[in-house]
Amino acid sequence: MFKNSKLSRYRALKILECFCLDIDATKTAHLLRLNRKTVNRYFLAFRTLIASHQSEEKERFVGIVEVDESFFGPARIRGRQGPRKRGRGTNKQPVFGIYERNGRVYTELVRNCSATTLQAIIRGRISPESVIHSDGWRGYDGLVDVGFDKHLRINKSKHFASNGVHINGIEAFWSFTKRRLSKFNGVKKNFELHLKECEWRYGKSLDQLIAELRNLVANNRILMV
């Protein structure tokens, strides 16, 4: 799969399948009788390719769209400074997320959760005709003033859902992501790659994952199938 690699195409595709099955590098190396460094090299290449693909997606979110922030830690991402939560007193990394009710997800590491920061992402990623669901965080104040006149809020201290207004979809994604990342012991290194991988994996069948990754690899200049 790597150009000039001595690994057979069959073995390379088996590595890809193990990756899509979410089998870790150690177990994959054992199952396929390969050096773990070889498997790690492939896994890192896959994650880099996936992250690039997800970040380059330009289609705006439309319809009913949920927005929310979550915090990952305890370590901060190297090179990023500034507030780490809605309030104060934590070094956790804030991540902003957008969830379209068809299952599509977008995530972005942010410096803080201020209105300026969140609105900039919302304006770039969500169509103004969309119906935005959020909680009551003040970072979402003023969305109507910047063209999003269909903004509905849920008070989570009282209800998880009210008259169809909820952010259960994006919260389910946060749960999926944190549960999955826990097996990597927090993935302080390459956190953004793992985050984008979760974004890519969410809600897809194994067949979809394999087909999509094979397509990404086939269209890449460094990797080939």
Please report, for each region that a protein language model flagged, where it lies by residue.
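Residue-level recognition of single "structural anchor" positions
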Residues: 1-225
